[in-house]
Amino acid sequence: MIDNKRGSSYLNSLPEGLSAEECDRYSAVVSLCWNVLGELQDVEFKWHEPLAYHTTFRVGGPAACLARPRSESALLALLERVRENSVPYVVLGGGSNVLVTDGPIPALVIQLIHVAAGLAFNKGRSSSRPLVVVGAGVPISRLLRFCVRNELGGLECLVGIPGSVGGAVVMNAGTAEGTIAEALEWLDALDGAGQRQLVFKADLPAGYRSMGLPEAWLILGGAFRLHVSSGRSLKREMRSLMVRRKATQPLGRPSAGCVFKNPVEAPAGALIERAGLKGFRMGNAQVSDKHANWIINLGSARARDILALISLVENEVFGKFGVRLEREIRILSPEKNSLNQMLNS
């Protein structure tokens, strides 16, 4: 529930530097959220929350309102109220595959860090292929620790990938060693009308960096068919994979991982490197000198620097090789076609 004693400060304070049009649109969303969501129970609200705090790129302007439901029932009530009142909204997962623009975002941003966070499997099961049920809000790193602790193999390919399980499912995250879809059994989701859907992997058109889900669906969780392994061998395998990743990827810098999908002609990183752009920078955004398909924030980059660098890479690769790179990351901006998304990332 919203603290009404602080209401005037929330409604009257706006981010600096807005044009009159931006100010009107942003303040309208703040007021709308305040008026239609204020009585909801078991939801944490933050106002004018910088999204740079919630993305792995560490860039992004403030959201009109950020909501964190503390239970599944609170999430369902929030989404119902949002749909009934046409509140522009985005569901944001771990923020690992998204670039938020610098300006204020006139929308409600919903995070699932307090809900859809369960992890369970039947320890007494005699099968060598146990089923693990995971909430969409569970960080991938936590899922992997759970697997090691319970000696369950099958998801080692995800080591080093940031973000949440929900985001990993939406984009069918993976590496050269495999993808999350390979272990997926079924998904628990809300469709665009807010109806609960149980979808089996056999019914999903999963492909490269996509699970083939409708844009408006929200992942609540899923089940993964794993195999019994030894905790020691799992640790050894994950450690080996992590050493390789650290040697070839700039894991210590703020980034969103690979920026582009690999085209059929050649890996995107190889094309970018052949175009002479490895290490190239614009402002404090740089094409990584470790992996050319990664753009990193050197510490004080703005989203506009990163976007300009992405556009330059696209134009240079197309000009030299005739290949149009397709973006793997999602862009969240004040534009209306950017909102009402289930980023889950």
Curated annotation (Swiss-Prot):
GO biological process: cell division; cell wall organization; peptidoglycan biosynthetic process; regulation of cell shape
Enzymatic reactions: UDP-N-acetyl-alpha-D-muramate + NADP(+) = UDP-N-acetyl-3-O-(1-carboxyvinyl)-alpha-D-glucosamine + NADPH + H(+)
Highest rank taxon of the organism: Bacteria
Keywords, alphabetical: Cell cycle, Cell division, Cell shape, Cell wall biogenesis/degradation, Cytoplasm, FAD, Flavoprotein, NADP, Oxidoreductase, Peptidoglycan synthesis
Pfam families according to UniProt: FAD_binding_4, MurB_C
GO cellular component: cytosol
Pathway: Cell wall biogenesis; peptidoglycan biosynthesis
Xref: InterPro entries: FAD-bd_PCMH, FAD-bd_PCMH-like_sf, FAD-bd_PCMH_sub1, FAD-bd_PCMH_sub2, MurB, MurB_C, MurB_C_sf, Oxid_FAD_bind_N
Family note: Belongs to the MurB family.
Protein name as catalogued: UDP-N-acetylenolpyruvoylglucosamine reductase
Organism whose genome encodes this protein: Syntrophobacter fumaroxidans (strain DSM 10017 / MPOB)
